[in-house]
């Protein structure tokens, strides 16, 4: 699905959110009608607008270091020692971008999440639920239009302002118990052409989609996950980002 976002077709157009929605529908059979594509700046902006988020950074490796990583090329410097935080927007972005620590110059290796991106996604989901539990309430509804206006230049979406206002009323009764997370069945694959990617198990996905979402398996329009970006397309060379 990440690969679909970075997919470049024959005309040179980048797939983006539209291609991602198409890929999800082809793989799961579930229609995706709306999307919001956030930049890192938008994420930081929203968290700062909502106010600090209480969140605990675990001692991932038992060494008291926590999440520390430096990438001068991207001007990325993550510094989140273990402990309790009143997390601001910049720290929230660090949390979501963190994958592993710096390379140990003596050994040439680095410490990272035990289960790789699966653990990273789980950490992101925990933070999302913390945001929902602490900040999503009836009073937020009044702030939604102004927040949407403020970040409009930092996001890509097919929501109109009127639709945002229309659907925001449902936030009044929303909590993290309404959020259910599922992972597409499959396995990791790594090669020089595609990098590290997750190959979906289409048979198991059909079963999951029927059991969890109630959509019939015959809605799934691809048996080849590598072609999920387009019916006649090929697999993207992009790795997991």
Report residues per predicted region.
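Non-catalytic, solvent-exposed segments at the cell envelope interface
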Residues: 1-241
């Amino acid at each position: 699905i990440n690969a679909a976002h970075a997919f470049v077709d024959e005309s040179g157009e980048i797939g983006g959110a539209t291609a991602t929605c198409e890929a999800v529908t082809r793989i799961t059979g579930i229609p995706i009608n709306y999307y919001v594509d956030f930049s890192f700046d938008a994420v930081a902006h929203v968290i700062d607008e909502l106010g600090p988020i209480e969140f605990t950074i675990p001692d991932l490796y038992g060494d008291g270091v926590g999440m520390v990583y430096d990438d001068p090329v991207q001007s990325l410097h993550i510094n989140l020692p273990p402990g309790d935080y009143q997390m601001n927007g910049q720290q929230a972005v660090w949390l979501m971008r963190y994958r592993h620590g710096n390379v140990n110059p003596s050994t040439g290796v680095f410490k990272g999440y035990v289960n790789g991106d699966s653990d990273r996604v789980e950490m992101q989901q925990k933070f999302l639920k913390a945001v929902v539990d602490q900040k999503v309430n009836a009073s937020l509804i009044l702030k939604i239009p102004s927040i949407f206006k403020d970040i409009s230049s930092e996001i890509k979406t097919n929501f109109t302002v009127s639709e945002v206002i229309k659907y925001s009323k449902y936030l009044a009764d929303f909590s993290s118990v309404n959020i259910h997370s599922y992972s597409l069945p499959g396995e990791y694959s790594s090669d020089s052409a595609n990098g590290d990617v997750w190959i979906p198990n289409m048979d198991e996905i059909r079963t999951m989609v029927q059991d969890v979402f109630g959509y019939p398996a015959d809605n799934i329009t691809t048996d080849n996950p590598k072609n999920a970006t387009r019916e006649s397309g090929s697999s993207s060379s992009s790795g997991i980002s």
